[in-house]
């Protein structure tokens, strides 16, 4: 059994929106997950596609794994730091804008 991990830290995406995409590819074959991510019109899908391709490349290069046997094991989307910005409003007031980020972890394994 071989398990390979790829991580993306501080992705400019809220964890809630990232989890919507993560739920679609969890426990899928790698080829099926790539197809799903390519045709999903979400920002998180684009980020996870690059991360999944990185995990596949890690498995191939470091462990000599066969792509056809690989399966997406764990997809974890956790909250990261929130960037706090200020938007000026009328009469000298200001509103806070929270730009949320997340950490995405994908584990790929050849386990059935």
From Swiss-Prot:
Q: A GO molecular function for this record? A: structural constituent of ribosome
GO CC annotation, single: cytosolic large ribosomal subunit
InterPro entries tied to this protein:
Ribosomal_uL22 (IPR001063), Ribosomal_uL22_bac/chlpt-type (IPR005727), Ribosomal_uL22_bac/org-type (IPR047867), Ribosomal_uL22_CS (IPR018260), Ribosomal_uL22_sf (IPR036394)
- Span-the-membrane segments of this chain are none
Pfam families given in the database record: Ribosomal_L22 (PF00237)
PANTHER family attached here?
A: CHLOROPLAST 50S RIBOSOMAL PROTEIN L22-RELATED, LARGE RIBOSOMAL SUBUNIT PROTEIN UL22M
Its subunit composition reads:
Part of the 50S ribosomal subunit.
Q: Which family does it belong to?
A: Belongs to the universal ribosomal protein uL22 family.
This molecule's function is given as: This protein binds specifically to 23S rRNA; its binding is stimulated by other ribosomal proteins, e.g. L4, L17, and L20. It is important during the early stages of 50S assembly. It makes multiple contacts with different domains of the 23S rRNA in the assembled 50S subunit and ribosome.
Name the chain's protein. Large ribosomal subunit protein uL22
């Amino acid at each position: 059994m071989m398990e390979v991990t790829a991580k993306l830290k501080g992705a400019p995406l809220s964890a809630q929106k990232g989890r919507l995409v993560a739920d679609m590819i969890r426990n899928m074959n790698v080829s099926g997950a790539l197809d799903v991510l390519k045709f999903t019109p979400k920002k998180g899908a684009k980020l996870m596609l690059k991360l999944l391709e990185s995990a596949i490349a890690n498995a191939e290069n470091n462990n000599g794994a066969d792509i056809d046997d690989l399966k997406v094991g764990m997809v974890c989307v956790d909250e990261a730091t929130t960037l706090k910005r200020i938007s000026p409003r009328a009469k000298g007031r200001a509103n806070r804008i929270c730009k949320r980020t997340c950490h995405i972890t994908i584990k790929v394994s050849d386990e059935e």
